[in-house]
Amino acid sequence: MQNRNTFSWVKEQMTRSIFVSMMIYIITRASISNAYPIFAQQGYENPREATGRIVCANCHLANKPVDIEVPQAVLPDTVFEAVVRIPYDMQLKQVLANGKKGGLNVGAVLILPDGFELAPPDRISPAMKEKIGNLSFQSYRPTKKNILVIGPVPGQKYNEILFPILSPDPATKKEVHFLKYPIYVGGNRGRGQIYPDGSKSNNTVYNASASGIISRIIRKEKGGYEITIANALDGRQVVDIIPPGPELLVSEGESIKLDQPLTSNPNVGGFGQGDAEIVLQDPLRIQGLFLFLASVILAQIFLVLKKKQFEKVQLAEMNF
């Protein structure tokens, strides 16, 4: 009886352990594959360095264009559109983590002035919601609501990303003023070449770690290669591991030099950054401008009427 209870307890513990392990695996894979911006969020307090460089460029090495469009000026406590465009050739396919080819994902980081933030859902118009689609934005940090990140999302559908932004009101936020402010943006298409820990992804070129003769190339079952390089002087052998994805450029018996490319560069994506300016406009200034324009128009009208009156007087004197 005791042996049966022991067996049941062991069976229950094993089942529970397997279930917990599976859940951890699923959650971990989901968080890694669906949260590329988290790499920057975990490693950097601020995504924009003192030099002006956005840290995403540390992992996405190729330079590509990005564009941002915002209104020239906005009023306080107003929702407006910030449109980020990440252009690329839609026919391109990138190397995925498993070595296969697939479509490119895109992502973006938007660095707004202090006080500007993501518009709450109840302030977004139905027309703007339709433009946004199913995109989900998040703050870079809970304390940095002015820095927004998005991605990775399918580039075929979202190479143009609309951020709904709420402008601050200086009447309620004393640290905000009616001024011209800069806005910074970074956008990438495709996977990066380097992981945050400094290791290479399979979406980059692999170089020889030593000079010598390639004595053996082994193709792995799951893809990728093991390349053995023998030093011609001392016979010392070095093995370079190539993950699935990059295409091999060398063959057995070939003489190579240190840092010579062993593979092609499969990367078709890249990162770009840009900036724009926006004016937080004081409504009183606009009212003052309208009053000034109205006074100018009235002055012109009175001037024309006065001129006509003067011409009539002159004409009457001439007839007299």
From Swiss-Prot:
UniProt KW Heme keyword: yes
Stored InterPro entries: Cyt-f_TM, Cyt_f, Cyt_f_lg_dom, Cyt_f_lg_dom_sf, Rudment_hybrid_motif
Binding-site residues, heme: Y36, C56, C59, H60
Comment on bound cofactor: Binds 1 heme group covalently.
GO molecular function list: electron transfer activity; heme binding; iron ion binding
Locations listed in the record: Plastid, Chloroplast thylakoid membrane
Residues spanning the signal sequence: 1-35
Residue stretches spanning the membrane: 286-306
Membrane topology reported for the UniProt record: Single-pass membrane protein
Keyword match Chloroplast: yes
Cofactor(s) for this UniProt protein: heme
Keywords: Chloroplast, Electron transport, Heme, Iron, Membrane, Metal-binding, Photosynthesis, Plastid, Signal, Thylakoid, Transmembrane, Transmembrane helix, Transport
Quaternary structure (record): The 4 large subunits of the cytochrome b6-f complex are cytochrome b6, subunit IV (17 kDa polypeptide, petD), cytochrome f and the Rieske protein, while the 4 small subunits are PetG, PetL, PetM and PetN. The complex functions as a dimer.
Principal location: plastid
Gene Ontology biological-process entries: photosynthesis
Gene name tied to this protein: petA
Name by which UniProt lists this protein: Cytochrome f
Function per UniProt: Component of the cytochrome b6-f complex, which mediates electron transfer between photosystem II (PSII) and photosystem I (PSI), cyclic electron flow around PSI, and state transitions.
Family that this chain belongs to: Belongs to the cytochrome f family.
GO cellular component term of the entry, any: chloroplast thylakoid membrane
